[in-house]
Amino acid sequence: DEVLKTEITIKDSHNALTEKTNNAVVKFDHVDFKYADGEENVLEDIDFEAKPGQTVAIIGSTGSGKSTLAKLIPRFFDVTNGKITLDGVDIRDISIETLRSQIGYVPQTGILFSGDINSNISYGAPGIDEAGIKEAAQIAQATEFIEDKPDKFESAIAQGGTNVSGGQKQRLSIARAIARNPKIYIFDDSFSALDFKTDTQLRKALKPKTKDATVFIVAQRVSTILHADQILVLDEGKLVGKGTHKELVKTCETYMQIAKSQLSEAEFAASIEGKED
């Protein structure tokens, strides 16, 4: 009942653009954000640019605003001050359908629908063929467990994915985003339910597929983002560091503390020398 009474606050502007972008350059231009019922900014003066072919990672302690930042890109919320642009156009001037059709968003907890594996992967990718579905599953490291099921890709999925494990649910959600072949990928802490080996294999397989896309990864594990082209370090909603792993361990105390708390001395040394996997 409450949902029905809630007014939709994110709406299309009067002359919203419906043409898709050629080049997914995402720019945060001095963005502040606070929730409608909040008194203080959750994000403050966030300023950066992400280009196609780049992986931009977002890291920080719990409550630092990582997921909130990611949710601003598909306009789940609107910025309070500043603006976010896609190819130089304020995303508030682009129709919501057009904007979101170019984004593959994977939340922290995978979302599945009642149906079968095929329909869950192809949801949001009209016209995708069997080969496309299988490729998406392969990249998402889901093929092995799918092939182990008696009905393979036609295996039933319960509403909410209650009949698959957390890691399997996550891999199917990632496969769905890949199947869309979007210009922008947002992985909102989507790899946390995966073991280290699967995480590594998935990111390796993902790289050639996303080479022309703009990729955002919200992460808790430093190991997930060592090779990111740009790492944004958030602390209490502020951007306290921006650069590569090797740059940030020298210039950003917050990042150095996170890295040293998660990596062994040997791993930390190898990561700076570029000898890690």
Q: Which residue ranges define each predicted feature?
A:
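ABC-type nucleotide-binding domain
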Residues: 5-13, 17-277
